Amino acid sequence: MTTTMKTFVAFVLTVFFIMSSAHCRTTTGGSPGYGIGGRTKTCFTPALCIYRGVHGCDSYCKTKNFDYGYCRQEHCCCVNY
């Protein structure tokens, strides 16, 4: 009985340790850039550039909290500084 209880407690503590280390990882994506990292570009495949042109792509990107958008072939690319 004690071996099973010790194994169970060790298992629970191991799971808690793994979960806490997985949730506590820091990311650099939300840190302020101050122009050091340059700009980030994300391209989407909706047909905005085909049907609505550059203006449609730009307004789509601004609703997604990007700085601006431009068309590259049929893709709409959004840019953040």
Swiss-Prot record:
Taxonomic superkingdom: Eukaryota
Keyword Secreted included in the entry's annotation: yes
Keyword Cytoplasm recorded: no
Keywords: Antimicrobial, Disulfide bond, Fungicide, Plant defense, Secreted, Signal
Main location as per UniProt: secreted
Signal peptide span: 1-24
GO annotation terms (biological process): defense response to fungus; killing of cells of another organism
Disulfide pattern: C43-C78, C49-C71, C57-C76, C61-C77
Localization annotation: Secreted
GO cellular component labels: extracellular region
Residue intervals passing through the bilayer: none
Family: Belongs to the DEFL family.
The protein's name: Putative defensin-like protein 102
